[in-house]
Amino acid sequence: MAVVTMRQLLESGVHFGHQTRRWNPKMKRFIFTERNGIYIIDLRQTLDYIEKAYEFVRGTVAEGGSILFVGTKKQAQEAIAEQATRVGQPYVNHRWLGGMLTNFQTVYKRLQRMKELEALGDLSGTAAGYTKKETLQLNREKGKLSRTLGGLRDMQKLPAAIWVVDTKKEHIAVDEARKLGIPVIAVLDTNCDPDEVDYPIPGNDDAIRSAELLTKVVAAAVADGLIARSGRRRGTDEKPEAGVATDEPLAEWERELLEEPKKSDEQPAKSDELPVKTDEQPTKSDEQPAAAAAE
């Protein structure tokens, strides 16, 4: 069964990059052309890199590793939480607290505190033995911990790899992973730095449908890895057929998009078709609180 098709990538807008004035020259090799002032990403390369990332994730999970899903921008929050939960993986979709990886011991203590508060159950009323003020404080603490660390509830150790939507916004998460030697799988938009990612997937990291589709692909790889892990425990090596289908008939304008562009020594060739990408990347915050802020 195919993981994703060329048509799905096109329909989800994965090929739309940023405006030409907002680009990283290191991404030039992933750019197909330029139209209406925006860059168009080469989806043939995207398919190739999806295959590589898929096999890596599947193999990592099959060997017992976990994948941390990271995406705190509005367009990715729902997909990150939904897909990570579906395959039983940890996730961060509210806010990345500095030290979540590099200071995991402290984060783990806060996770234990969150579970303690949840075990207390309903703190309303005096039956629990707390005053109204104490009850209010405990509920606030529980709510704050749940929002920031709820997705890490069952994470007992550092992840084997992380999946990131928007490496520029999640630069602290990427930096921490690199310091610890944790592989990074990520969507690479035309304004990103490919040198920061171990398993890049060239694509649109701003559109909701694009982030959702690519996160589903990673979740599917995790699911296949879990099946393989289970098969090994039973003495078999189950490997579901998984690949990328590119032979589905395409519309004329889609075939035209995939035609070889004219080579240029400078920037990708210009054209005047296709609509301009409207999803702008949210302004990233200049500050990230420390892990201790969750206390």
Swiss-Prot record:
Spans annotated as Disordered: 232-295
Please name the GO terms of the biological process aspect recorded for this protein, alphabetically: translation
Q: Which GO terms describe its cellular component?
A: cytosolic small ribosomal subunit
Q: Which GO terms describe its molecular function?
A: structural constituent of ribosome
Has UniProt tagged this entry with the keyword Ribonucleoprotein?
A: yes
Q: Which CDD domains match?
A: RPS2
Give residue spans, biased composition: Basic and acidic residues: 252-287
- Which Pfam families is this protein grouped with? Ribosomal_S2 (PF00318)
Q: Does the keyword Iron-sulfur apply?
A: no
Could you tell me the keywords of this UniProt record?
Answer: Ribonucleoprotein, Ribosomal protein
Q: Which InterPro entries match?
A: Ribosomal_uS2 (IPR001865), Ribosomal_uS2_bac/mit/plastid (IPR005706), Ribosomal_uS2_CS (IPR018130), Ribosomal_uS2_flav_dom_sf (IPR023591)
What is the similarity comment for this entry?
Belongs to the universal ribosomal protein uS2 family.
Descriptive protein name? Small ribosomal subunit protein uS2
| Organism, scientific name | Salinispora tropica (strain ATCC BAA-916 / DSM 44818 / JCM 13857 / NBRC 105044 / CNB-440)
What lineage, starting at the top, does this entry show? Bacteria, Bacillati, Actinomycetota, Actinomycetes, Micromonosporales
Gene encoding the protein = rpsB
